[in-house]
Amino acid sequence: MLSPPRATVHATMSVVSSWYDRGTRLSPAADALAERQQVEMTAADAPAEWQQVEIAKVRLLAMCEAAGMGREVNRRAKVRPAIQALEALNPVPRPLESPELLSGCWRLVFTTSDSILGLPRARPFRPRPGRILQSIGPDLSVVLNEEWVLQGALKNTARARLVPRDDGRTVDISFDRFSIGWLRIPVPALAVGLRKDARTGRRVPPANPPRNAGVLETTFLDETLRISRGDKGNLFVLVRQGPSRV
């Protein structure tokens, strides 16, 4: 991992931190701010690779905000190129081998998943902006998704087990418990583990996984931001919120 000068870290994090603090809205000049940040970082003589990543992150966060976390469906396509640009700069190609980075509590700032955003639901039952969290345990074996609805009065959760694949970036997910407020709903135990391919000897997922299972690939990871792709083609951009809640 590159170690940029202290002044550069402070300059960049002031932009990113202000975005965190404001929760869901950036000023219309966010993209111009990113360009100004580029000048500041160049002046601080930061390593070029780190500089490029930080600028791409600030621009992506601005575009996520403009798309309303993905709720503005017609703006989603504009976010994809910014995601792909950052994925190409991924400093951690095998995130499963860096549990100290991948674990923790992450806050969702953009997704293309209508169900995660609650768009099919009545408006009061949609998650509050900035209140969709995902916690990954220290050993990367458990994940907890949390959302708050009804103006934050009710919390829904979904807990799942993670099984890593051999590529170092993909996990198979098996949900084992859901809760709606105080009501816990266990999921019947299902054999979701990987099977051994007779031809290659590699572990592969079952041909017909159950509906409460999925696949998630981490395509970008650093200390503050994560990008993941799901098996149904959905994109997820998350920022670090704090320590894991599982």
Model-derived features: positions:
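N-terminal chloroplast transit peptides
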Residues: M1-A32, M41
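Compositionally biased, intrinsically disordered low-complexity segments enriched
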Residues: T12, V39-T42, V53-E54, I136
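Acidic, low-complexity intrinsically disordered regions
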Residues: M13-V15, A32, A46, L102, ...
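Intrinsically disordered, low-complexity linker/propeptide segments enriched in Ser/Thr/Gly/Pro
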Residues: A34-A48
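Soluble ligand-binding/transfer domains with enclosed cavities or grooves
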Residues: E49-V246
